[in-house]
Amino acid sequence: MQLSFRWYGDSDPVTLKQIKQIPDMKHIVSAIYDVPVGDVWTKDKINALKSSIEQEGLTLSVMESLPVHESIKLGEANRDNLIENYKKSLRNLGESGIKTVCYNFMPVFDWTRSNLDYELEDGSKTLMYDNDFVKDIDPVTTNLNLPGWDESYTKEEMATLIEKYRQFDEEDLWKNLEYFLNAVLPIAIEHDIDLTIHPDDPPWSIFGIPRIIKTKESYQRLIAINSSKNNGICFCTGSLGCLEENDLPEIIKEFGDHIHFVHMRNIKRLDNHSFVESGHLSKYGSVDMKAVVRALKDINYKGTIRPDHGRMIWGETGKAGYGLFDRALGATYINGLIEGVETNDTTIS
């Protein structure tokens, strides 16, 4: 198990020099952020990013995310051209030495929260999802923008997309995911790229739009499309942990051959599908983080783990969920869990 850290490139207020001072931190998760969704990621851009990271003594190990264009998810007439571009990007990544690529198949909204500055009892600020608040919002008719909404869309473009997806059910979305995977997985397999799908965040339908990657049954259906290990999973404890029915260690054990990337964060489940993102320690949330790491050890997981969202602590400001301080604390906690399970120390929790 190897620690990694999300870095948003030169515009990120968290620097590579700071990241490499985190104990045992050697790997970076990043992406090409200045290319429009659907265009090709060139080798020049990929290798320039790699070089900037390697100059600081770190390794670019995961690309998160290589985004899937909405027209592919919708199955529109131009999807084949967009899929060809996706395949070219995958080839360029593989030929540049990138072997793990994360993506998602969430319609319109990659993730949604109702509050980025929810104050916990200790005074730290965190991300929060209030389901009672969100369920009464219609993005088509309201002027409100919630955290996680793609601001590259105009109000009119977003409304059009949402109305298209409201004509969909889960079967329609599954059909389009299968079409996409049947097209791109041969390229991933050829270049030994583990293509890892991130679960929906949160893992249920919002705004009348279907979501499909949310439970054990979702992964069973995913693997049924193609059983290759390259048809992979990004295992996110925070997203999957929002549903109490998801037994995270059991999911890890069932799908271990397909898990190639792990996001570790804790959440505190509240009533009626609401939740707050807590500190990483097990006792602060609803996810048994030690049980997750032990399950990863049991499947002999050798891939990367990144401390996912952190709280804003000690007066830090910046991109919500992606400050330095609490994610660094999360990394050291994960280090301790790994050391504990590898030495069978039952006192670690």
From Swiss-Prot:
| InterPro entries, per the entry | Man_deHydtase, Xyl_isomerase-like_sf
Domain of life from the UniProt record? Bacteria
Does the keyword Manganese belong to this entry?
yes
What Pfam families does this protein map onto?
A: UxuA
- What catalytic activity is recorded? D-mannonate = 2-dehydro-3-deoxy-D-gluconate + H2O
Q: Which GO terms describe its biological process?
A: D-glucuronate catabolic process
**Pathway it works in:** Carbohydrate metabolism; pentose and glucuronate interconversion
Q: Which cofactor does it need?
A: Fe(2+); Mn(2+)
UniProt-recorded Gene Ontology molecular function terms: ferrous iron binding; manganese ion binding; mannonate dehydratase activity
Keywords tagged on the record: Iron, Lyase, Manganese
Which SUPFAM superfamilies does its entry note? Xylose isomerase-like
EC code(s) of this entry:
4.2.1.8
What family does the entry list?
Belongs to the mannonate dehydratase family.
HAMAP family (alphabetical):
UxuA
| Biological role | Catalyzes the dehydration of D-mannonate.
What is the protein's given name? Mannonate dehydratase
Q: Which organism is it from?
A: Oceanobacillus iheyensis (strain DSM 14371 / CIP 107618 / JCM 11309 / KCTC 3954 / HTE831)
